């Protein structure tokens, strides 16, 4: 099935609280108990079903900035925060007629997104879709208040653990939820609940893993211990190793409280080997409060092999809350939000090779001096699959807009938000260098080109990539990939030259010889002789045949653009794709439910639920 919320109006309407049902967080057990596969639990259930299987990420040290990071020491990162703002009905990541909605996009620096204001066991389907295509796991949160467990949650957990655990796992698998998350800072004397949750978590992890899910992970805030008491900041030991589980009985990953630095001896791999053999210290997440005020421990983290846990706040994402710091219009807020997340996850320079030394800081609001999460981890990629089964296409669409374009043609001028249609976006954001594959600070071009998303135009969707400035010679590394090419594959670059001039070539390299550009002379995208025309999308296609036949059989490891002789360049990039043959057209959808939600002087709001083969 598919789902859609529509707003046909001159000024789009925000998703109203009564337009779509939110499941109740404490009642997951009741939902699972009533669930019959193939039958709807409630009318809006389809809004919480993911249609995209989680993709598995791959490793290639040659296309990492820091080649010393391996599976054993490359930190994971859980972003345990709300999507948007929970006030005014908690629209979260559900489809919406409001452009100024949160379109998170720096997925390559996140391994799990715990949607803090999504219900326990549920995540909006579109949000799960875009996370899954990028190889990121998702979960909702059981937001149990601190202190003695309430009757509501005691009853809810009792119902949940009283159900066959495998049915819960099947429920999560069906809906595309990759684990269970808990704000576990409650106390309880119920061994039935505690032992039942441990058994449930083990079953969920085992079942989803056996179903081929590469991103399954349950998260437990390290407050409630094995005995139902609250013991923060005690490391891993006899008090919580059953909740954590060993390598043969994987149950949860632990999100450590913010004073984790005080028990470093209890967080080493040797400690993990003692209390949970077969697990990794990277399954322990050093907690950081995005609101600030926690101990400044970033330099300490550099010396310990722990993953990163980011929380904050209860009702809104702190990076989202800062988006109005550079202007109050919706376009200014959206543009600055993308700038902020690029700074936070890459670094203040938004270029991972222009590194900033890690220092201690309790304020986690990014700025030009922020060292970024790229100081601790690689940018990960899921861009590896059989092109005969699925083409690789990016229109650089963020999943929201002030208008909607399709193949360069304006469809309407209504605001919209649907993060589920967000495209694959550049991996490193933005790896500019004077040399192809240049990885050190001396390869940073002073006053070089700039890159950012623009909401002024789009080939498909509501945004595209804007590249602008002047430079003699510079490379922009776009995508970390591992696509095996075949004869007759077609590589497409689509652009609009808004102003200025440049020589631009596509620069590709192959796995095993990543430093060598493959026949750059055969990939001319733009020349200084081309005239600017801000009305025309120009398509350049390159077929794996003739002079480019030597690409057949090679696995493309790097996709980059090479700029030379750029003067006042203003270039919109609307598509990069690699396709193999013609993809079949999907069957027309079968409308299941179509209803008007509201009619008002601004237009009509509606909801459509449909089935597709």
Show the residue positions of the predicted features.
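Substrate-binding surface in catalytic domains of secreted glycosidases
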Residues: 183-361
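Extracellular beta-strand ligand-recognition surfaces/modules
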Residues: 493, 537-579
